[in-house]
Amino acid sequence: MSDHQSRGQDFSLEADSELRFEIEQKDAKVLVTLVNGFAELFGTELVKKKKYEFGMGAKVAIFTYQGCVLHVTGKMDVCYISKETPMVQYVNCHAALEQFRTEAEEKDRRGPVAMVVGPTDVGKSTLCRILLNYAVRVGRRPLYADLDVGQGAIAISGNVATILIERPASVEEGFPKTAPLVYHFGHKSPSGNSVLYNAVVSKMAEVTLQSLNGNKRTKSSGIIVNTCGWVKGHGYAHLLHAARAYGACAIFVLDQERLYNELLRDVPSSVHVVLLPKSGGVVERSKELRHECRDQRIKEYFYGNARAPFYPFSFEVKFQELRLYKIGAPPLPDSCMPIGMKAEDNKTKVVAVTPTPALIHHVLALSFAESVDDDVIGTNIAGFCCVTEVDMERQVVMLLSPQPRPLPPNALLLWSELQFMDNHT
Protein backbone atom coordinates (compact mmCIF):
# COMPACT_ATOMS: atom_id res chain seq x y z
CA MET A 1 0.00 0.00 0.00
CA SER A 2 1.35 3.43 -0.91
CA ASP A 3 1.93 6.10 1.72
CA HIS A 4 -1.02 8.06 0.31
CA GLN A 5 -3.31 5.04 0.63
CA SER A 6 -2.15 4.26 4.17
CA ARG A 7 -2.74 7.86 5.32
CA GLY A 8 -6.08 8.00 3.56
CA GLN A 9 -7.94 10.82 1.89
CA ASP A 10 -10.71 13.21 2.91
CA PHE A 11 -13.69 13.69 0.58
CA SER A 12 -15.91 16.73 1.07
CA LEU A 13 -19.42 16.12 -0.28
CA GLU A 14 -21.96 18.84 -1.00
CA ALA A 15 -25.66 18.36 -0.22
CA ASP A 16 -27.47 15.80 -2.44
CA SER A 17 -24.27 14.19 -3.73
CA GLU A 18 -22.63 10.82 -3.16
CA LEU A 19 -19.20 9.20 -3.00
CA ARG A 20 -19.00 6.09 -5.16
CA PHE A 21 -16.24 3.53 -5.10
CA GLU A 22 -15.60 -0.07 -6.17
CA ILE A 23 -13.21 -2.71 -4.87
CA GLU A 24 -12.26 -5.49 -7.27
CA GLN A 25 -8.92 -6.77 -5.98
CA LYS A 26 -8.89 -9.86 -3.81
CA ASP A 27 -7.94 -9.25 -0.15
CA ALA A 28 -8.27 -5.48 -0.65
CA LYS A 29 -9.70 -3.57 2.31
CA VAL A 30 -11.11 -0.05 2.43
CA LEU A 31 -12.02 1.81 5.63
CA VAL A 32 -14.54 4.68 5.60
CA THR A 33 -15.15 7.11 8.47
CA LEU A 34 -17.75 9.88 8.66
CA VAL A 35 -15.74 12.85 9.97
CA ASN A 36 -18.59 15.36 10.17
CA GLY A 37 -22.04 16.01 8.73
CA PHE A 38 -24.65 13.36 7.94
CA ALA A 39 -24.39 10.50 5.43
CA GLU A 40 -26.05 7.19 4.65
CA LEU A 41 -25.38 4.01 2.70
CA PHE A 42 -28.47 2.71 0.89
CA GLY A 43 -30.71 4.23 3.56
CA THR A 44 -28.63 3.25 6.63
CA GLU A 45 -27.20 6.23 8.53
CA LEU A 46 -23.46 6.24 9.16
CA VAL A 47 -22.33 6.81 12.74
CA LYS A 48 -19.83 9.64 13.14
CA LYS A 49 -16.21 8.60 13.88
CA LYS A 50 -16.99 4.89 13.40
CA LYS A 51 -14.84 2.97 10.90
CA TYR A 52 -16.67 0.89 8.28
CA GLU A 53 -14.79 -1.84 6.42
CA PHE A 54 -15.44 -2.94 2.83
CA GLY A 55 -13.76 -5.76 0.90
CA MET A 56 -13.54 -7.31 -2.55
CA GLY A 57 -16.66 -6.96 -4.66
CA ALA A 58 -17.99 -3.93 -2.77
CA LYS A 59 -19.78 -1.33 -4.88
CA VAL A 60 -20.49 1.52 -2.51
CA ALA A 61 -22.47 4.76 -2.84
CA ILE A 62 -22.47 6.95 0.29
CA PHE A 63 -25.08 9.71 -0.04
CA THR A 64 -25.60 12.93 1.92
CA TYR A 65 -28.68 15.16 2.01
CA GLN A 66 -26.93 17.97 3.91
CA GLY A 67 -23.22 17.63 3.10
CA CYS A 68 -20.45 15.75 4.91
CA VAL A 69 -16.75 14.91 5.08
CA LEU A 70 -15.65 11.28 4.67
CA HIS A 71 -12.18 9.88 5.41
CA VAL A 72 -11.28 6.90 3.22
CA THR A 73 -8.26 4.60 3.62
CA GLY A 74 -7.25 1.77 1.28
CA LYS A 75 -6.98 0.91 -2.41
CA MET A 76 -10.07 1.38 -4.58
CA ASP A 77 -10.33 0.52 -8.27
CA VAL A 78 -12.84 3.31 -8.92
CA CYS A 79 -13.59 6.33 -6.72
CA TYR A 80 -15.42 9.58 -7.50
CA ILE A 81 -18.04 12.05 -6.23
CA SER A 82 -21.27 12.39 -8.21
CA LYS A 83 -23.96 15.05 -8.00
CA GLU A 84 -26.17 13.12 -10.44
CA THR A 85 -28.11 10.80 -8.15
CA PRO A 86 -31.70 9.50 -8.13
CA MET A 87 -31.91 9.51 -4.32
CA VAL A 88 -34.41 12.39 -4.25
CA GLN A 89 -36.80 10.38 -6.50
CA TYR A 90 -36.27 7.33 -4.29
CA VAL A 91 -37.12 9.21 -1.10
CA ASN A 92 -40.25 10.54 -2.85
CA CYS A 93 -41.29 6.90 -3.42
CA HIS A 94 -40.80 6.26 0.29
CA ALA A 95 -42.95 9.31 1.11
CA ALA A 96 -45.73 8.00 -1.14
CA LEU A 97 -45.60 4.58 0.54
CA GLU A 98 -45.74 6.31 3.94
CA GLN A 99 -49.01 7.96 2.94
CA PHE A 100 -50.44 4.53 2.12
CA ARG A 101 -49.18 3.18 5.46
CA THR A 102 -50.66 6.03 7.47
CA GLU A 103 -54.04 5.53 5.82
CA ALA A 104 -53.83 1.75 6.35
CA GLU A 105 -52.98 2.31 10.02
CA GLU A 106 -55.95 4.60 10.54
CA LYS A 107 -58.40 2.23 8.83
CA ASP A 108 -56.82 -1.04 10.08
CA ARG A 109 -56.14 -2.20 6.54
CA ARG A 110 -53.24 -3.94 4.88
CA GLY A 111 -50.36 -1.60 4.06
CA PRO A 112 -48.88 -1.11 0.60
CA VAL A 113 -47.34 -3.94 -1.40
CA ALA A 114 -44.68 -2.39 -3.63
CA MET A 115 -42.82 -4.35 -6.31
CA VAL A 116 -39.43 -3.28 -7.67
CA VAL A 117 -38.92 -4.46 -11.26
CA GLY A 118 -36.43 -3.98 -14.07
CA PRO A 119 -33.77 -5.77 -16.12
CA THR A 120 -30.56 -7.11 -14.59
CA ASP A 121 -28.04 -4.72 -13.06
CA VAL A 122 -30.23 -1.65 -12.59
CA GLY A 123 -30.15 -1.59 -8.76
CA LYS A 124 -33.39 -3.39 -7.81
CA SER A 125 -32.00 -4.92 -4.60
CA THR A 126 -30.45 -1.57 -3.67
CA LEU A 127 -33.75 0.29 -4.09
CA CYS A 128 -35.49 -2.37 -1.97
CA ARG A 129 -32.86 -1.89 0.73
CA ILE A 130 -33.30 1.90 0.64
CA LEU A 131 -37.11 1.71 0.90
CA LEU A 132 -36.94 -0.84 3.73
CA ASN A 133 -34.37 1.19 5.67
CA TYR A 134 -36.38 4.38 5.35
CA ALA A 135 -39.49 2.51 6.53
CA VAL A 136 -37.89 1.14 9.72
CA ARG A 137 -36.28 4.51 10.47
CA VAL A 138 -39.79 5.96 10.88
CA GLY A 139 -40.96 3.08 13.06
CA ARG A 140 -42.41 0.65 10.51
CA ARG A 141 -41.91 -3.13 10.38
CA PRO A 142 -42.28 -4.13 6.73
CA LEU A 143 -41.81 -7.55 5.19
CA TYR A 144 -39.18 -8.06 2.50
CA ALA A 145 -40.04 -10.66 -0.15
CA ASP A 146 -37.22 -11.70 -2.50
CA LEU A 147 -38.38 -13.51 -5.65
CA ASP A 148 -34.99 -13.26 -7.40
CA VAL A 149 -33.86 -16.89 -7.57
CA GLY A 150 -30.74 -15.95 -9.53
CA GLN A 151 -29.10 -13.63 -6.99
CA GLY A 152 -30.90 -14.17 -3.69
CA ALA A 153 -30.64 -11.33 -1.16
CA ILE A 154 -32.10 -13.32 1.77
CA ALA A 155 -31.52 -17.02 1.10
CA ILE A 156 -29.03 -18.61 -1.26
CA SER A 157 -29.93 -18.68 -4.96
CA GLY A 158 -32.58 -21.11 -6.19
CA ASN A 159 -35.13 -20.14 -3.53
CA VAL A 160 -37.70 -17.46 -2.78
CA ALA A 161 -37.67 -15.97 0.70
CA THR A 162 -39.36 -13.45 2.99
CA ILE A 163 -38.05 -11.80 6.13
CA LEU A 164 -39.39 -9.31 8.68
CA ILE A 165 -37.36 -6.08 8.77
CA GLU A 166 -37.26 -4.57 12.26
CA ARG A 167 -34.10 -2.44 12.15
CA PRO A 168 -31.95 -0.74 9.51
CA ALA A 169 -29.50 -2.90 7.59
CA SER A 170 -25.91 -3.09 8.78
CA VAL A 171 -23.71 -0.82 6.66
CA GLU A 172 -21.26 -3.65 6.02
CA GLU A 173 -23.44 -6.79 6.01
CA GLY A 174 -26.96 -5.75 5.08
CA PHE A 175 -30.09 -7.06 6.81
CA PRO A 176 -29.80 -9.88 9.35
CA LYS A 177 -30.88 -13.22 7.85
CA THR A 178 -32.48 -14.60 11.02
CA ALA A 179 -35.73 -16.59 10.77
CA PRO A 180 -36.48 -16.21 7.06
CA LEU A 181 -39.42 -17.98 5.44
CA VAL A 182 -37.90 -19.87 2.49
CA TYR A 183 -39.51 -21.93 -0.27
CA HIS A 184 -37.47 -24.21 -2.51
CA PHE A 185 -37.36 -23.73 -6.28
CA GLY A 186 -34.10 -25.43 -7.22
CA HIS A 187 -33.08 -23.46 -10.33
CA LYS A 188 -31.06 -20.29 -11.00
CA SER A 189 -33.72 -18.82 -13.30
CA PRO A 190 -37.52 -19.08 -13.46
CA SER A 191 -37.00 -20.55 -16.94
CA GLY A 192 -35.71 -23.72 -15.25
CA ASN A 193 -39.34 -24.61 -14.44
CA SER A 194 -41.85 -21.82 -15.11
CA VAL A 195 -44.85 -23.76 -13.77
CA LEU A 196 -43.07 -24.53 -10.50
CA TYR A 197 -41.83 -20.93 -10.14
CA ASN A 198 -45.37 -19.56 -10.39
CA ALA A 199 -46.59 -22.17 -7.88
CA VAL A 200 -43.86 -21.25 -5.39
CA VAL A 201 -44.48 -17.50 -5.80
CA SER A 202 -48.23 -18.03 -5.30
CA LYS A 203 -47.61 -20.01 -2.11
CA MET A 204 -45.16 -17.44 -0.76
CA ALA A 205 -47.60 -14.61 -1.50
CA GLU A 206 -50.49 -16.47 0.16
CA VAL A 207 -48.53 -17.21 3.35
CA THR A 208 -46.95 -13.75 3.49
CA LEU A 209 -50.23 -11.88 3.06
CA GLN A 210 -51.86 -14.06 5.74
CA SER A 211 -48.98 -13.35 8.14
CA LEU A 212 -49.65 -9.61 7.94
CA ASN A 213 -52.77 -10.13 10.04
CA GLY A 214 -50.70 -11.41 12.96
CA ASN A 215 -49.20 -8.02 13.87
CA LYS A 216 -50.93 -4.66 13.51
CA ARG A 217 -47.69 -2.75 12.94
CA THR A 218 -46.48 -5.12 10.24
CA LYS A 219 -49.93 -5.20 8.66
CA SER A 220 -49.91 -1.44 8.03
CA SER A 221 -46.22 -1.45 7.05
CA GLY A 222 -46.82 -3.70 4.04
CA ILE A 223 -44.34 -5.56 1.83
CA ILE A 224 -41.46 -4.63 -0.47
CA VAL A 225 -41.04 -7.25 -3.23
CA ASN A 226 -37.78 -7.73 -5.13
CA THR A 227 -37.98 -9.51 -8.50
CA CYS A 228 -35.84 -11.23 -11.15
CA GLY A 229 -34.16 -9.34 -13.98
CA TRP A 230 -35.89 -11.44 -16.65
CA VAL A 231 -38.46 -8.98 -18.02
CA LYS A 232 -39.29 -10.24 -21.54
CA GLY A 233 -41.55 -13.05 -22.76
CA HIS A 234 -42.14 -15.60 -20.00
CA GLY A 235 -40.16 -13.39 -17.61
CA TYR A 236 -42.69 -10.59 -18.07
CA ALA A 237 -45.52 -13.09 -17.53
CA HIS A 238 -43.90 -14.03 -14.20
CA LEU A 239 -43.88 -10.35 -13.16
CA LEU A 240 -47.60 -10.05 -13.93
CA HIS A 241 -48.26 -13.27 -12.01
CA ALA A 242 -46.36 -11.95 -8.96
CA ALA A 243 -48.21 -8.61 -9.11
CA ARG A 244 -51.55 -10.46 -9.07
CA ALA A 245 -50.49 -12.94 -6.38
CA TYR A 246 -49.33 -10.19 -4.01
CA GLY A 247 -52.03 -7.69 -4.94
CA ALA A 248 -49.39 -5.05 -5.61
CA CYS A 249 -50.59 -1.46 -5.31
CA ALA A 250 -47.34 0.10 -6.58
CA ILE A 251 -44.74 -1.06 -9.10
CA PHE A 252 -41.44 0.81 -9.33
CA VAL A 253 -39.84 0.26 -12.75
CA LEU A 254 -36.11 0.89 -12.94
CA ASP A 255 -34.53 2.15 -16.15
CA GLN A 256 -36.75 0.57 -18.80
CA GLU A 257 -39.45 2.61 -20.51
CA ARG A 258 -40.69 -0.36 -22.54
CA LEU A 259 -41.40 -2.40 -19.40
CA TYR A 260 -43.04 0.64 -17.81
CA ASN A 261 -45.45 1.05 -20.74
CA GLU A 262 -46.23 -2.67 -20.91
CA LEU A 263 -47.15 -2.66 -17.22
CA LEU A 264 -49.28 0.47 -17.63
CA ARG A 265 -51.17 -1.45 -20.32
CA ASP A 266 -51.52 -4.76 -18.49
CA VAL A 267 -52.03 -4.07 -14.77
CA PRO A 268 -55.24 -2.62 -13.29
CA SER A 269 -55.48 1.19 -13.35
CA SER A 270 -55.59 1.15 -9.54
CA VAL A 271 -51.93 0.04 -9.47
CA HIS A 272 -49.46 2.94 -9.40
CA VAL A 273 -46.72 2.24 -11.97
CA VAL A 274 -43.73 4.59 -11.56
CA LEU A 275 -40.71 4.85 -13.88
CA LEU A 276 -37.47 5.59 -12.02
CA PRO A 277 -33.89 6.17 -13.21
CA LYS A 278 -31.15 3.82 -12.13
CA SER A 279 -28.19 5.22 -10.24
CA GLY A 280 -25.13 6.11 -12.30
CA GLY A 281 -23.16 4.04 -9.81
CA VAL A 282 -24.86 0.77 -10.82
CA VAL A 283 -22.31 -1.56 -12.41
CA GLU A 284 -23.08 -4.26 -14.98
CA ARG A 285 -21.98 -7.68 -13.73
CA SER A 286 -20.50 -10.30 -16.03
CA LYS A 287 -21.81 -13.87 -16.09
CA GLU A 288 -18.62 -14.92 -14.27
CA LEU A 289 -19.12 -12.33 -11.53
CA ARG A 290 -22.73 -13.42 -11.04
CA HIS A 291 -21.50 -17.00 -10.62
CA GLU A 292 -18.87 -15.82 -8.10
CA CYS A 293 -21.51 -13.91 -6.13
CA ARG A 294 -23.75 -17.00 -5.97
CA ASP A 295 -20.79 -19.10 -4.87
CA GLN A 296 -19.84 -16.57 -2.21
CA ARG A 297 -23.37 -16.56 -0.76
CA ILE A 298 -23.33 -20.36 -0.47
CA LYS A 299 -19.87 -20.27 1.10
CA GLU A 300 -21.06 -17.69 3.66
CA TYR A 301 -24.06 -19.89 4.46
CA PHE A 302 -21.76 -22.73 5.51
CA TYR A 303 -18.65 -20.88 6.69
CA GLY A 304 -19.83 -17.38 7.66
CA ASN A 305 -17.40 -14.50 7.14
CA ALA A 306 -14.34 -12.97 8.80
CA ARG A 307 -16.48 -11.11 11.36
CA ALA A 308 -18.63 -14.14 12.24
CA PRO A 309 -17.07 -17.44 11.11
CA PHE A 310 -19.11 -20.67 11.12
CA TYR A 311 -17.75 -24.20 11.48
CA PRO A 312 -19.89 -26.68 9.50
CA PHE A 313 -19.91 -30.45 9.90
CA SER A 314 -19.19 -33.26 7.43
CA PHE A 315 -20.76 -36.68 7.87
CA GLU A 316 -21.78 -39.74 5.88
CA VAL A 317 -25.33 -40.84 5.12
CA LYS A 318 -26.14 -44.28 3.71
CA PHE A 319 -28.02 -44.42 0.42
CA GLN A 320 -30.82 -46.38 2.09
CA GLU A 321 -31.26 -43.59 4.68
CA LEU A 322 -31.25 -40.80 2.10
CA ARG A 323 -34.75 -39.60 1.17
CA LEU A 324 -33.83 -37.47 -1.84
CA TYR A 325 -36.33 -36.02 -4.32
CA LYS A 326 -36.57 -33.57 -7.17
CA ILE A 327 -39.56 -31.39 -8.07
CA GLY A 328 -40.33 -31.73 -11.77
CA ALA A 329 -40.24 -34.85 -13.93
CA PRO A 330 -39.01 -34.99 -17.55
CA PRO A 331 -41.66 -33.63 -19.94
CA LEU A 332 -44.01 -36.03 -21.72
CA PRO A 333 -46.48 -35.32 -24.52
CA ASP A 334 -50.13 -35.01 -23.45
CA SER A 335 -50.91 -38.25 -25.31
CA CYS A 336 -48.63 -40.16 -22.91
CA MET A 337 -50.11 -38.68 -19.74
CA PRO A 338 -52.70 -40.46 -17.56
CA ILE A 339 -56.31 -39.48 -18.20
CA GLY A 340 -57.08 -36.08 -16.71
CA MET A 341 -53.45 -34.98 -16.47
CA LYS A 342 -51.63 -32.45 -18.66
CA ALA A 343 -47.94 -32.32 -19.54
CA GLU A 344 -47.42 -29.28 -17.30
CA ASP A 345 -48.56 -31.32 -14.27
CA ASN A 346 -45.26 -33.16 -14.57
CA LYS A 347 -43.49 -29.87 -13.81
CA THR A 348 -44.67 -30.02 -10.20
CA LYS A 349 -44.40 -33.77 -9.69
CA VAL A 350 -42.12 -34.94 -6.86
CA VAL A 351 -39.83 -37.72 -8.11
CA ALA A 352 -37.21 -39.78 -6.29
CA VAL A 353 -33.52 -39.22 -7.10
CA THR A 354 -31.07 -42.13 -7.05
CA PRO A 355 -27.61 -41.16 -5.73
CA THR A 356 -24.88 -41.25 -8.39
CA PRO A 357 -21.53 -39.44 -8.77
CA ALA A 358 -23.44 -36.76 -10.73
CA LEU A 359 -24.82 -35.61 -7.37
CA ILE A 360 -21.39 -34.37 -6.16
CA HIS A 361 -21.27 -30.62 -5.35
CA HIS A 362 -25.05 -30.19 -5.59
CA VAL A 363 -26.77 -28.16 -2.88
CA LEU A 364 -29.76 -29.90 -1.28
CA ALA A 365 -32.63 -28.25 0.59
CA LEU A 366 -33.97 -29.81 3.80
CA SER A 367 -37.77 -29.59 3.69
CA PHE A 368 -40.09 -29.38 6.70
CA ALA A 369 -42.32 -31.83 4.80
CA GLU A 370 -42.16 -35.31 6.35
CA SER A 371 -43.46 -37.26 3.37
CA VAL A 372 -43.88 -36.92 -0.38
CA ASP A 373 -47.60 -37.25 0.34
CA ASP A 374 -47.40 -33.82 2.02
CA ASP A 375 -47.60 -30.61 0.01
CA VAL A 376 -43.85 -30.52 -0.67
CA ILE A 377 -43.99 -27.45 -2.93
CA GLY A 378 -46.08 -25.59 -0.37
CA THR A 379 -43.87 -26.52 2.60
CA ASN A 380 -41.02 -24.20 3.56
CA ILE A 381 -37.48 -25.41 4.12
CA ALA A 382 -35.29 -25.61 7.22
CA GLY A 383 -31.85 -25.20 5.64
CA PHE A 384 -29.32 -26.55 3.19
CA CYS A 385 -26.56 -29.13 2.89
CA CYS A 386 -24.10 -29.93 0.12
CA VAL A 387 -22.98 -33.28 -1.32
CA THR A 388 -19.17 -33.36 -1.20
CA GLU A 389 -18.64 -37.05 -2.02
CA VAL A 390 -20.54 -40.06 -3.40
CA ASP A 391 -19.07 -43.51 -2.70
CA MET A 392 -20.85 -46.01 -4.92
CA GLU A 393 -18.89 -48.94 -3.51
CA ARG A 394 -19.79 -48.22 0.12
CA GLN A 395 -23.22 -46.80 -0.84
CA VAL A 396 -22.79 -43.57 1.14
CA VAL A 397 -22.80 -39.83 0.45
CA MET A 398 -20.77 -37.26 2.37
CA LEU A 399 -22.73 -34.14 3.33
CA LEU A 400 -21.53 -30.69 4.37
CA SER A 401 -24.05 -29.35 6.87
CA PRO A 402 -24.41 -26.44 9.35
CA GLN A 403 -25.72 -28.97 11.89
CA PRO A 404 -23.99 -32.14 13.16
CA ARG A 405 -25.19 -35.64 12.36
CA PRO A 406 -27.68 -37.18 12.18
CA LEU A 407 -30.16 -35.67 9.77
CA PRO A 408 -33.53 -34.97 11.43
CA PRO A 409 -35.95 -37.94 11.56
CA ASN A 410 -37.86 -38.35 8.29
CA ALA A 411 -35.60 -35.74 6.68
CA LEU A 412 -36.74 -35.04 3.14
CA LEU A 413 -34.02 -33.56 0.91
CA LEU A 414 -34.73 -31.70 -2.32
CA TRP A 415 -32.31 -31.59 -5.26
CA SER A 416 -31.24 -28.28 -6.81
CA GLU A 417 -29.14 -27.43 -9.84
CA LEU A 418 -26.99 -25.15 -7.67
CA GLN A 419 -23.49 -26.44 -7.11
CA PHE A 420 -20.81 -25.51 -4.59
CA MET A 421 -17.17 -26.60 -4.73
CA ASP A 422 -16.10 -26.87 -1.10
CA ASN A 423 -12.48 -25.73 -1.29
CA HIS A 424 -12.49 -24.22 2.19
CA THR A 425 -9.31 -24.88 4.14
UniProtKB/Swiss-Prot annotation:
Keywords: ATP-binding, mRNA processing, Nucleotide-binding, Nucleus. ATP binds at residues 18, 59, 121-126. GO terms for biological process: mRNA 3'-end processing; tRNA splicing, via endonucleolytic cleavage and ligation. One of its GO terms (cellular component) is tRNA-intron endonuclease complex. GO terms for molecular function: ATP binding; polynucleotide 5'-hydroxyl-kinase activity. InterPro entries: Clp1, Clp1/Grc3, Clp1_C, Clp1_C_sf, Clp1_N, Clp1_N_sf, CLP1_P, P-loop_NTPase. It is found in: Nucleus. Belongs to the Clp1 family. Clp1 subfamily. Required for endonucleolytic cleavage during polyadenylation-dependent pre-mRNA 3'-end formation. This is Protein CLP1 homolog. The lineage of its organism: Eukaryota, Metazoa, Ecdysozoa, Arthropoda, Hexapoda. The gene is cbc.
